[in-house]
A protein has these predicted regions:
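N-terminal, Lys/Arg-enriched amphipathic/low-complexity engagement segments
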Residues: 1-47
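A generic structural signal for short beta-strands and their flanking turns/coil linkers
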Residues: 30, 73-75, 91
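Generic detection of short hydrophobic beta-strand segments and adjacent strand-loop junctions
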Residues: 32-34, 71-73, 104-109
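Generic structural motif
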Residues: 38-42, 54-57, 66, 70-81
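Acidic, glycine-anchored pre-beta loop/turn
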Residues: 48-54, 83-86
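Short hydrophobic beta/alpha edge segments that flank linear recognition/processing sites
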Residues: 55-68, 91-99
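Buried, small/hydrophobic-residue-enriched core segments of structured protein domains
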Residues: 85-134
Length: 134
């Protein structure tokens, strides 16, 4: 027989003391890579070149078949390297992050006041559209 314990209406475990109130400093990497292979069905077209400055949210890649579908930069910084594989296939775009984060301003919107086309346009322009899976 297994030792299963069935709980009804929860279980209070008396633990003495309180949680330590401390936070850890976040660690942000120096170099971020945007990999087109992470986005299924995307045929990437490069929109930046080495040495270009990018802001978080600015487009880095676009789809060749649907140019309105964009992949945006997750950090602000400088494009340090464009890595290509066999037959010049685009493998990754490396971005060297700068000290502070600067963002592209897409404005604030209330979803209830927007039409479906406006929501779709905002998702396409700001980048999260490529992460949606149907």
């Amino acid at each position: 027989m297994s030792n299963n314990i069935d709980l009804k209406q929860g279980l209070n475990i008396p633990i003495s003391g309180a949680a330590v109130q401390k936070t850890r400093k976040t660690v942000s990497p120096d170099v971020i890579a945007v990999k087109p292979t992470d986005f299924k069905g995307l045929t990437p077209r490069l929109l930046v070149k080495e040495g270009d400055k990018v802001l978080a949210g600015s487009p880095v890649l676009a789809d060749k078949k649907n140019p309105e579908i964009l992949v945006t930069s997750p950090v602000s910084g400088t494009v340090s390297e464009v890595v290509r594989g066999e037959k010049r296939k685009l493998l990754e775009v490396k971005i060297k992050a700068d000290g502070q984060q600067e963002y592209v301003d897409f404005g604030t919107h209330k979803a209830s006041d927007m039409s479906a086309d406006e929501v779709k346009e905002l998702l396409l322009k700001s980048g999260p559209w490529v992460s949606l899976v149907q």
